[in-house]
Amino acid sequence: MAGGGLQTAMTARTLESHPIHLGKGATAVPQPEFPRDERAIQWYRDYGARHADDGEEGRLVSCYGFAEDWPGWEMHPAGAEVVVCLEGSMTLIQKIGGEEVRTTLKPGEYAINPPGTWHTADVPEAATGLFITAGAGTQHRPR
């Protein structure tokens, strides 16, 4: 294998159940199964600990389905976040200069949350999104 890395067998997984960590050295590391319940907060804490050495260069690639508006706001101070709509539609809401800026995404469209930008989303019906997130230091607050 080029670069002297270890070669491992490929395993098919779904991004919704097993997110991927993109790290330093162009690594891509499948993550443990993501729980869809109260254990999710601990999963994120454990993820941060597992990949702390990547710091602000680490990215989480994840996929989530939504049936309703997001209940809170979030902000990623370490870097930009890419949001891609895969199915349905979602309106991404960003707080920029004290104003709410709304961008509606349809399948195949994306938007970027700049570092430090508080954001949430309205989901009029069901939607699925792909997220590439610089998660170090992520903050949350109620909507």
Give the ranges of each region predicted by the language model.
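A short beta-loop-beta micro-motif enriched in histidine and acidic residues
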Residues: E56, A67-V82, G98-E99
